A protein has these predicted regions:
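Nucleotide-sugar donor-binding/catalytic module of glycosyltransferases
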Residues: 1-217
């Protein structure tokens, strides 16, 4: 079973476009687990208005993006997810994102993370760049030795990655005090399992003034 997990917080402005892009994936067999992190705007009523049976809505108090995603990982594991894909509330997924990434995560013998390239858009949805990997000068290792590279340059964005069940089980107890979940999980995969890069753009990642961090929005 595939689980897409999303943490929301005061995201009503961009959320409909992202939800629609996820729910219109060409690979349709998945659940979308959404945890609202104590929003004070219209995010929760908006989410309640979606009737797609694949959506699982959790409403909680504000604990911050990292802890919120930790709770989502636990829920995905509890529901038996074999693959988990992280989803920001303000991006736009290309229609075949899951279809392109799912085959790469069928491996079950080792903890594995797959991440892809992406393009960028601004707050108005205007395309601001093509390949992020190329424009940022990311040095993606060709030999599969990701651990030292990730220590020097944490370039795995959660919004563009997925993990298998083995890595999910290693990610259920994220340490307190880490800034974001994606770097920690990527380092865990690189040290104890496998990391694979898909050199294709699978999402439009939105950079705007309200992103959760300068690297990646919540």
């Amino acid at each position: 079973m595939i689980a897409v997990i999303m943490s929301t917080y005061n995201g009503e402005k961009y959320l409909p476009q992202q939800l629609d892009s996820v729910l219109r994936q060409t690979l349709e067999d998945f659940i979308l687990i959404i945890r609202d992190d104590g929003s004070s705007d219209g995010t929760v009523p908006l989410l309640r208005g979606y009737t797609d049976e694949r959506i699982v809505l959790l409403e909680g108090k504000n604990v911050g993006p990292c802890r919120s995603f930790a709770l989502l990982l636990q829920e995905a594991a509890r529901r038996g997810a074999q693959q988990v894909y992280f989803c920001d509330q303000d991006d736009v997924w290309l229609p075949d994102k899951l279809a392109r990434m799912e085959p790469l995560l069928r491996e079950t013998d080792v903890p594995k993370l797959v991440f892809s390239d992406f393009s960028t858009i601004d707050g108005d949805g205007v395309r601001t760049g093509g390949s992020y990997a190329a424009s940022a000068g990311l040095r993606i290792p060709q030999d599969g030795d990701f651990f030292p590279k990730l220590l020097a340059q944490p370039y795995v964005f959660g919004c563009a990655c997925g993990i298998n069940r083995r890595l999910l089980e290693l990610s259920l107890d994220l340490p307190d005090g880490i800034e974001m979940y994606d770097c920690w999980i990527a380092l865990t995969a690189a040290l104890l399992g496998k990391v694979e890069y898909l050199p294709e753009q699978t999402i439009q990642h939105r950079f705007h003034s309200s992103n959760a961090t300068g690297r990646a929005g919540q």
